[in-house]
């Protein structure tokens, strides 16, 4: 799932913007005529709406290979018109430092005119090519679009343990990499995807409950207020689970927002089932694990004192599925993961919408039974339900994993409001 130049003006903090707008509007209204009052009220309403309007999409560095998904696809699909932020994933974390992931894809790959965002081919002697140059071109078309470099992810989170031993040195390395003069002005901040602090992911971390806030505090101190600092965090709201393992509330003061990963609750790593939706919004009768759903995650994080405006609603632009299933409804047994294009047990929405159309809904998301395969995924209709929940809860916006899973015309992202 990140020679120094002058700082860029960072987006005004949401809460500060809203409060100032409302306060200013109230003062002006006292002596304003009807037209002025209406304009001020409209401005205040727009500011309040913007508080929950972030749309953050992950772009995967490796997607330019087998998936053949490039930065140009963000533009051609219409997704760039909906996005407020892109998380470029992933940079590596190794040796206690932030590091490049795939340097060739990021900075060296030459793009033809046909594959370039602006229709201009790369030349052999230009200093920057690859995804970074394409992102820069995308920002030129969409000046309000912000790009964050995301570090870690499932595969590269093992390096955070060493990084946590010297947070200041880690933060310095991240800043130096994100702000490298070769790709100056591509990135507007950093996103940390540590899976998981003081808990188990691909490997088990024992850095302690305070390691995460110390790391995020060091990043904020180094990047300052002119850059975005965000983090993808666990959605495990169970008692004694991953949310409890780290001090996410203590770190909230340092981040612009959190991306709670409210997907992958269930999947074919439990090969025999029971089948269950991987991104349920709410609980339902027969759910395999209590508090494994989005509303439990948000309730727990808010209960810890984390402001709703700093929590984004997570969506998956893909499905998870089993095979060897006879029962149409959730809760059936299986024999293993269903076949997927790139990995068994997982498939893009753009494939599933036609290969295995939804046959029902449960817990605010969709499921489908096709032959002996059983899949769960979100559709434009279930995303609309989740948007109503997002707005009701006063959340800061929406994020999703990841852009290449959507249709060529951006069917899912266009359902986000």
Residue ranges and their predicted role:
Residues 64, 350-417:
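Extracellular low-complexity, Gly/Ser/Thr-rich intrinsically disordered linkers
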Residues 132-136, 171-178, 209-220, 248, ...:
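Generic structural signal for well-ordered alpha-helices
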Residues 174-206, 264:
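Active-site groove signature of glycoside hydrolases
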